[in-house]
């Protein structure tokens, strides 16, 4: 459960390390796994294609807040993380770092699921 001004890790190799959540798209107050958000880069690797202060769309792939699955089980992660997207909706990076949630497959982010090292 992420809200405006939340700081989030970046789970891809785009060059950004940490972002600030500016807006949750879709008229919602909080962002959960699979939601699209607008972020500002707060910390980036020197020499990368992304620079501090740039705005990007992103999709949430991990949250500390536990989410309930249809079978009644719950899942939560150790950190809040997102993957940066381009203006066309494609992934900015080429690799996904860390585990991602299975719920992304239901929300049509199959490329993120296929590139992830671990799907929980």
UniProtKB/Swiss-Prot annotation:
Q: Supply one GO CC term from the record.
A: cytosolic large ribosomal subunit
Indicate the secretion signal residues: none
The yes or no answer to whether the keyword Ribosomal protein is present is yes
- Report the protein's function: Binds to 23S rRNA. Forms part of two intersubunit bridges in the 70S ribosome.
Q: Which PANTHER family match?
A: 50S/60S RIBOSOMAL PROTEIN L14/L23, LARGE RIBOSOMAL SUBUNIT PROTEIN UL14M
**UniProt organism field:** Karelsulcia muelleri (strain GWSS) (Sulcia muelleri)
Biological processes, Gene Ontology terms: translation
Q: Which SMART domains match?
A: Ribosomal_L14
A single GO molecular-function term is: structural constituent of ribosome
Asked whether the keyword Ribosomal protein is assigned, the reply is: yes
Alphabetized Pfam families for the sequence: Ribosomal_L14
User: What InterPro entries does the annotation carry?
Assistant: Ribosomal_uL14, Ribosomal_uL14_bac-type, Ribosomal_uL14_CS, Ribosomal_uL14_sf
Alphabetical UniProt keywords: Ribonucleoprotein, Ribosomal protein, RNA-binding, rRNA-binding
- Quaternary data: Part of the 50S ribosomal subunit. Forms a cluster with proteins L3 and L19. In the 70S ribosome, L14 and L19 interact and together make contacts with the 16S rRNA in bridges B5 and B8.
PROSITE patterns per the UniProt record, alphabetical: RIBOSOMAL_L14
Point out the coiled-coil segments of this chain: none
* Record HAMAP family: Ribosomal_uL14
What protein name is recorded for this chain?
Large ribosomal subunit protein uL14
Family from the record: Belongs to the universal ribosomal protein uL14 family.
């Amino acid at each position: 459960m992420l809200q405006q001004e939340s700081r989030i890790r970046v789970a891809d190799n785009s060059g950004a390390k940490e972002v600030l959540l500016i807006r949750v798209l879709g008229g919602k107050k909080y962002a959960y796994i699979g939601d699209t958000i607008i972020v500002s880069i707060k910390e980036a690797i020197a020499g990368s294609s992304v620079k501090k202060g740039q705005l990007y769309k992103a999709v949430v792939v991990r949250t500390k807040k536990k989410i309930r699955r249809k079978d009644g089980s719950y899942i939560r992660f150790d950190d809040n993380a997102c993957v940066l997207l381009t203006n066309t909706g494609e992934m900015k990076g080429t690799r996904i770092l860390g585990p991602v949630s299975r719920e992304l497959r239901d929300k049509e982010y199959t490329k993120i699921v296929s590139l992830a090292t671990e799907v929980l």
